[in-house]
Amino acid sequence: MPTGPAVAKPLSGEERIARLPHRVRGALRRAAPALVLYATARLVGLAVAAAVASRAHRPLWITLGDSWDSKWYTGIAQHGYGTTIAGRTPGFTYNDMAFFPLYPALQRTLATLIPLHMTVTGLVAAWLSAFAAAWGIYAVGESLHGRRTGIVLALLWGILPHAVVETMAYSESLMTALSAWSLYAVLTRRWLWAGALALLAGLTRPNAVAVAMAVLCAAGLALRRSRRDRRDWRIWASAALAPLGWLGYLSWVGSRSGGPLGYFKIQQGWGSRFDFGVSELRFLKGVFTDRDTPPHLAYYMGAAVVFAGLAALVLLVLDRPPLPVLVYSIVLVAIAIGGSKFYACKPRFLLPAFPLMLPAAIALARARPRTTAVLLPAIAVVSAAYGAYSLFYADTAP
């Protein structure tokens, strides 16, 4: 006669691995609506871009895969680091060590596996990363506010004004994918995954330090709140792993460029430095008040996205998300706004800051179906049109 409830036997490592494919299929099945909607939004954007490319007599795949930053990534993938070019502005020097290594490494790896041009493998890497990012964004949204919010959150990421970047041979999609899944691992207390993914994210872009700080924040909170957690080696390991990618690359650059601050000196050669937003404010003032500044849609859009990002951050704070999610968002906004130069690219720098859209996703998930059926397609059309403009008519990098 039983004396109490049966206690489930903990799964062994082998049993967990055996069950992994089943769990992945189940998670993919739940995320399918979000991924289908995201893919549809990006296909619409690509279709509009293809139509404009045809009229402009410019190959779409070259524009997406071999322009602006894509050229630098392809060069690193083909030849490694070591390219330095004198800038058009006196005193500027463009050094390819400004670009982090993981995306070109993935690009090169794909080129060794499939017999395609390096430009094409760059696009394949970006598209796979974008799909993984949309899935991770859905997972975070579902974990925090339910399935419907997760679906809307993933779709919103695909119809942002600069969402065309998600289908270019850029590193933002890879960073977003790794960051989203690292945050999801934090939220579900998968500590080793959180640290390992943050480590990889730190090898994608300089602003990926945000996810390392989020993991460190989560680990610190866990260690502070629970005596039991202080004995969990996985939490300590995640905190140790999270910043290693970012710090490791900066250390490597420093060893090749004359000191621990070598990476930041290289960034200064590109005209980029952190000045707490002074240059940003000066530039925005010039855009709206200086008659000598020519009107430029990319600058106006950049300003609009910056203001929207700040407003979204306030709403996110009021929504009181888990502290690691908030830390991640604040750091990304601070880096994007506090850095000088590349003003038209500020929206691109904010692409990984998907938690900023959580308040909007929650509101749309609760709205009437008719409202979302009208509003979201309208936003998608604007996104597709602006994406085509930024690719073929703007004279600044998307």
What are the residue ranges of the model-derived segments?
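Membrane-lumen/periplasm interface segments of specific transmembrane helices
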Residues: 41-57, 212-309, 324-329
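Transmembrane-helix signature of polytopic, membrane-embedded enzymes
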Residues: 117-121, 137-159, 193, 323, ...
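Membrane-interface alpha helices of multi-pass inner-membrane proteins
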Residues: 158, 179-184, 192-217, 241-244, ...
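Short acidic/glycine- and proline-prone juxtamembrane loop motifs at membrane-interface regions
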Residues: 168-174, 346-347
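Hydrophobic, aromatic-rich transmembrane alpha-helices
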Residues: 289-290, 297-326, 332-336, 354-360, ...
